[in-house]
Each structure stands twice: as structure tokens, then as C-alpha cells.
């Protein structure tokens, strides 16, 4: 083997090694990026798509994703709109493998479930609250506390017990 062939062979081996290292780095970066993707970002990529959400109460809601917040998702079916608190979602079918930033706006990032409950209270809408226990409470939200809601039926419900809110 002459020197030219040896150098060419070494160069080819170096290129192959560099290619493998770039591929490994790209795979590591992709895994690292996925590690930081939350369920709300995956749901944001599903806006206007159908999903089926299995709730902690044992029920499933199927419908179109209309909006997503940091800890909630708005799903509409043919008849109603449901705000589902993500902390009580067990699984989701139809979820995109893609992810999307909910919003770059600090204001939108601030719109968590508590913010949403305050807005629902201000609207004085009649709602049905699905609780973790499976119970349904139908009333208007009269007051929103730090961790609870006072309802028009003189019942107080802990926010941590709410699985979904459906406008009636």
C-alpha cells in the first residue's frame, strides 16, 4: 500500500468516525430536548385535532383540542366545552409526537387553572364540576379561593379535587 492509499484510508475512517459522532450528538440533543417537553406543549401541537382523554374520575372525554394553558386543556365535543385539569389526566389517545410552545407571551403563560377559574366565576356561568371521586357538582362558581371554590349550592370544593369543568 502506498502512502496516498494509506492517507485516503485514514481520511475515510476519520470521516466515518466524525459522521458517527455527529449522529450520536444529534440523537443526544433530540433526547435532551424531549426530556424538557411537557404534556401541555404536546397538546398545543394538537390544536383543532381530536383526542381522547382518560380522566382520574374513570371517565373519558373525546373531542377537539381548542386551547391549552400551562395546566389545563379546553376540549370541545359536539355539545359542550370541557376544561380539563392536566393534573388529573391519566392518559391521552391521539396525541401528536410533535410539541409546540403554548405561547411566547408571559401573559398567556400566566393563564393557569386558577386564572381560568376566576374568569369562569366572573362570567357567572352554570357549570358542572367532575370531581376525582366521580361526583358531579352542578352550580355557579361564586368565589375562588387560593385552593377552593365556593359554589352557588352552598358547597365548597377543593380545586385539587376538580378533574374537569363543563359549561352547561
Question: Predicted regions span which residues?
Answer:
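Short glycine-rich, low-complexity segments
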Residues: 1-62, 66-168
Amino acid at each position: 500500500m502506498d502512502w496516498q492509499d494509506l492517507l485516503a484510508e485514514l481520511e475515510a475512517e476519520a470521516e466515518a468516525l466524525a459522521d458517527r459522532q455527529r449522529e450520536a450528538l444529534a440523537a443526544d440533543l433530540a433526547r435532551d430536548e424531549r426530556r424538557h417537553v411537557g404534556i401541555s406543549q404536546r397538546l398545543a401541537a394538537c390544536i383543532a385535532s381530536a383526542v381522547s382523554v382518560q380522566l382520574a374520575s374513570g371517565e373519558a372525554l373525546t373531542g377537539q383540542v381548542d386551547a391549552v394553558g400551562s395546566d389545563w386543556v379546553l376540549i370541545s365535543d359536539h355539545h359542550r366545552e370541557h376544561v380539563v385539569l392536566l393534573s388529573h389526566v391519566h392518559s391521552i389517545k391521539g396525541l401528536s409526537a410533535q410539541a409546540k410552545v403554548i405561547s411566547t407571551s408571559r401573559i398567556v403563560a400566566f393563564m393557569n387553572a386558577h386564572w381560568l377559574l376566576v374568569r369562569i366565576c366572573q362570567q357567572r356561568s352554570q357549570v358542572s364540576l367532575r370531581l376525582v371521586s366521580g361526583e358531579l357538582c352542578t352550580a355557579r362558581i361564586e368565589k375562588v379561593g387560593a385552593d377552593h371554590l365556593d359554589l352557588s349550592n352552598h358547597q365548597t370544593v377543593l380545586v385539587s379535587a376538580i378533574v374537569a369543568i363543563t359549561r352547561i
